[in-house]
Amino acid sequence: MSKASIKLAFSDKYDHEHSLHYLEKHQDGMARKLSDYRDQQLARRALALAGGPNLVLDLPCGAGRFWSTLAEQPNRIILAADNSADMLATAMAAQPKHITEHVRTLQTSAFDINLPDNSVDSIFCMRLLHHIEKPEHRLALLKEFHRTTRDSVIISLWVDGNYKAWRRKALEKKRARRGRAHENSNRFVINRTTVEQEFIEAGFNIQTHLDFLASYSMWRVYVLRKNN
């Protein structure tokens, strides 16, 4: 299986309209604003733990939700990459100039990154891995990240072993009994031991992890270091 042949089911949906919706949804209501605040906290801490990398590949960058946090380090260059040209255009138009002056854009697939080996200090990958169900696809992604980064990867995903994961599993069983198993079928909870073994197999050491809300939330951020 070639890297270029891997394509996620939702990857073509982000036209201009969907990109605008994606930009707006994380500021829609108090709950999402608080969630975004916590996401930014975790991102800031993970970047510090990774040593404050200067050249960061934000992939997928989406609508630039994390750019203000990434740009807090004045000498940092943000290489913002996404599979969707519309998403990149939306992000550049929406974010203020003092943020975008730190940003260079790149349209590329996360599975086949159009960059040389060891070309960035860190890869910052938020809210992608929980969309990837197949272990072989996750491993292909992680190996491509290992090829491209010189040092670290910051990556978020849904893990098991918490209340939200238990609740989601119960809901999925209920949907299956009602013949509605296909609903929300593009997001997946990953076993912690399984994904940590995949990190190691791809050539990374696990420096640490940060939980959105320990024992309750599925969201976890890992800081990985390249094993040279």
Where are these regions (language model features)?
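Conserved beta-strand signature within the Rossmann-like core of class I S-adenosyl-L-methionine
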Residues: 150-158
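Short catalytic micro-motifs in class I SAM-dependent methyltransferases
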Residues: 127-131
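C-terminal alpha-helical "lid/dimerization" subdomain adjacent to the S-adenosyl-L-methionine
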Residues: 159-201, 208-210
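A short glycine-rich, Lys/Arg-flanked "PGG" loop and its adjoining helix->strand segment in the class I
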Residues: 139-151
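Conserved class I S-adenosyl-L-methionine
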Residues: 1-50
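Short conserved loop adjoining the S-adenosyl-L-methionine
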Residues: 112-117
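A conserved beta-strand element that flanks and buttresses the S-adenosyl-L-methionine
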Residues: 124
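Class I SAM-dependent methyltransferase SAM/SAH-binding core
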Residues: 57, 63-111
